[in-house]
Amino acid sequence: MWVRVARFEGGTAEGLETEMARSKQVLEELGSGGLPPGLEGVTRVMEAINRPEGTGLAVIFCDTEEDMRKADEALNNMSPPAEASGRRVSAGVYEVMHDKDMA
């Protein structure tokens, strides 16, 4: 399993809330209608925000390195979200070594 972690900084609490609502709607629509080119191999999306700091994370999961390479390329070519939700300051790809549900 592979993940891409993108970090966003410089957002406002209101801007982050707006972006998360928009993102949730887009993800729900994509889940029923297919993913954009390059993102077909994405198996899971997780987003997190820190309102007081104005930061956020987007974690994208793929099963294979090839699918992640395609997703990373597609995501790098997409426009970052609006200024109020922060700017992307980093994005990296990682191989998952351990994934254990502790519940």
Segments predicted by a language model, with ranges:
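Short S/T/G/P-rich N-terminal loop/turn motif that feeds into the first structured element of a domain
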Residues: M1-L57, D63-N77, E83-A103
